[in-house]
Swiss-Prot record:
Protein's UniProt name: Peptidyl-tRNA hydrolase
Family of the protein in this entry: Belongs to the PTH family.
EC number of the protein: 3.1.1.29
Gene it is expressed from: pth
Source organism: Saccharophagus degradans (strain 2-40 / ATCC 43961 / DSM 17024)
Reaction(s) this enzyme catalyzes, per UniProt: an N-acyl-L-alpha-aminoacyl-tRNA + H2O = an N-acyl-L-amino acid + a tRNA + H(+)
Length: 197
């Protein structure tokens, strides 16, 4: 599949709000964006008009917005659509960071477009963007419990320390590649990240 050369203008970290969900598997995307904002010295702040916590920063001369929706996971699209409409950001300039059952902890994979794969956050974003699936995704592996009936309980729990550390390692490995994505160099970001994790 051809990689795009679209510069990423919005990075969205998916998760559920509230202390009971902090650092659960389902909040891996939120953890990524919160750590990125902190590391770049631009912490997120509550922004009601965007239904989430928001920050705006400069990465290598490129204007990039960071968003963590404070709606629940299955309403994430409300926040994404609000930012995209306000700043006139096309779906292909959006990167959604989310937990991925089909990858083991410690893996991080970039992907362009595609379906929602049963992920309620992705499902709502696709719907809120007018059924547009063209946004990028950073998939952070959390592993699978082995039985579909166990998934909803599994994703809302904290991972055991070994798995949690592997997820954190993947988050740290992926963060430097945001600079490549901000300038539209998907090919380099994919090649280097996928060889590391």
């Amino acid at each position: 599949m051809k990689t795009p050369d679209t510069c990423i203008q919005l990075i969205v970290g998916l998760g559920n709000p509230g202390n009971e969900y902090e650092h659960t598997r389902h909040n891996a995307g939120q953890d990524f964006v919160e750590e990125l904002a902190r590391d770049l010295g631009q912490p997120l702040s509550p922004t009601p008009k965007f239904f989430g916590h928001f920050s705006r920063l400069n990465i290598n001369g490129k204007d990039v917005r960071l968003l963590v929706p404070t709606t629940y996971m299955n309403r994430s699209g409300q926040a994404v659509a609000a930012v995209c409409q306000f700043y006139k950001i096309p779906p292909e300039a959006v990167l959604v960071v989310h937990d991925e059952l089909d990858l083991p902890p410690g893996k991080a994979r970039l992907k362009i477009g595609g379906g929602h794969g049963g992920h309620n956050g992705l499902r709502d974003i696709i719907s809120s963007l007018g059924n547009n699936k063209d946004f990028g995704r950073l998939r952070l592996g959390i592993g699978h419990p082995g039985n579909a009936k166990l998934v909803s309980n599994y994703v809302l729990k904290k991972a055991p320390s070994e798995e949690f550390n592997a997820i954190e390692d993947a988050i740290r490995a992926a963060q430097p590649h945001v600079a490549d994505l901000a300038k539209g160099d998907w090919e380099k970001a994919m090649r280097e990240l996928h060889s590391k994790t």
